[in-house]
Amino acid sequence: MRGILRMTVLAAAVFGVAGNALAEDWKLAKDEDGVKVYLSSVQGSKYKAYRGVTDIKADVATIEALQEDVKGSCKWIHACAEMKLLKQEGADAWTYSKIDMPWPVTGRDVVIHVTTEKTADGTVIRHLKADPTYIPEEKGQIRVPKLVGEWKLQPKGQGVTEVTYQVETEPGGSIPSWLANSFVVDAPLNTLKGLRSAAEKR
């Protein structure tokens, strides 16, 4: 079920920037345990975009397999409460995730349309875009209205893969500034650490 892999990215992606804007002027915000996190302001949004980059000592196929494990992937995606595949058609998939928020902030959920492509050098790129009206909203959750991003798995040789995880989003509703500011760092940092740990144990 290789297509299920396309859903792996979404649960950690709840804060960032406007879905139709482009982030630029990336600045290093954190460099910890082999993971670099960059942030960028986005015109028209009060939320920052984030980009995380790390090297994983595993090949692309190993990382793909981890992402295809829908239930298992929720264990290493930051703030993931639930994740499931809604539909798959070839290179396109629609996924649903719930994201944990600290009390008293209302939890978020998000439907993501993921399109996967592979390049000639073996790089896998997963393009992410929110599709908030794909299914009815759930009671007790705030649906994320805008999100764009991507996963990029690029082979570097000798069994090493460079993984980039980038997201821009509008989380909907009201988010305290302290939470928004911490989430844009914690989401890529913890997600990439978790993925790396799982991949390198295989």
Curated annotation (Swiss-Prot):
PROSITE patterns: START. One of its GO terms (molecular function) is lipid binding. One of its GO terms (cellular component) is cytoplasm. Pfam families: START. Residues 1-202 form the START domain. InterPro entries: START-like_dom_sf, START_dom_prot, START_lipid-bd_dom, START_lipid_transfer. It comes from the Bacteria. May play a role in the interaction of the bacterium with animal cells. This is Uncharacterized protein PA1579. It comes from Pseudomonas aeruginosa (strain ATCC 15692 / DSM 22644 / CIP 104116 / JCM 14847 / LMG 12228 / 1C / PRS 101 / PAO1). The lineage of its organism: Bacteria, Pseudomonadati, Pseudomonadota, Gammaproteobacteria, Pseudomonadales.
